[in-house]
């Protein structure tokens, strides 16, 4: 093993180098340069497992701050659970205070950054969401920080997961907060709408405790709720207060968002968001149509590449699922590939036709 494992790790990094980058590597700066040349933005997310102690939480916080200090970086995601250890759901108020105190320096740096570097605008901080039990906590922390006077002029964002039924009430809460904030002279906020990528862990947690699962039971329910969230967010009376990141590789969902926004005259309200390294052809077409494209880009510390495995497993699990859009998009019948009589993409038997049928339901 001492001989094979280092070789396997190097090969693994070569294979997934287009999906996950070193946080301080030359490849990241090359990618940032390329994104800027293509008029794209990269949303950098520092990968890592759940923190168990204060020392690891502090290290993760400093690593995130190091990303923000890089003048080429203008967009960073951070999870509440990654910078504070041992969050206790029974001590909600205490957990909020700890998180606000820990995250405040990141937002303060963003406010001060344009005056301290070549930046012309503050870097964007996106408060990420993962586990269901962090939903209310993350919402409260987000609102608490952005309600402080020193951050009223800072535009920042938060994530909502459509596979949680609670996301509808959460979005309504964020809309009210955003409208109140802009009415008081503050900057708009942004909500990044995702389908949700933590289903397996939510299932394990619920089943091991005998609880009802927090997410929807089916992909169809999640997709329907995603459209419900888009319908509530993309409105003329909200557009000046709330920006919407439409984060999906499902072209039906993306098209629905774009057409809805255009029909309501709020097409400038949305950003198209996709995953770095996945479906580049579709990314190009969507950027040409929408005009604004943000790529979610995972990065890892060079010495901690092992933490990227869980992210890669989630991506593999999602893309391998037959109900997933990317699976349907890349599924080509073997006989068709060989020039046979397999079903065409428009055939009722094709995976893509199945995707369209579920969308129209």
Q: At which residue positions do the language-model features occur?
A:
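Positively charged, amphipathic and often flexible ligand-engagement surfaces
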Residues: 1-361
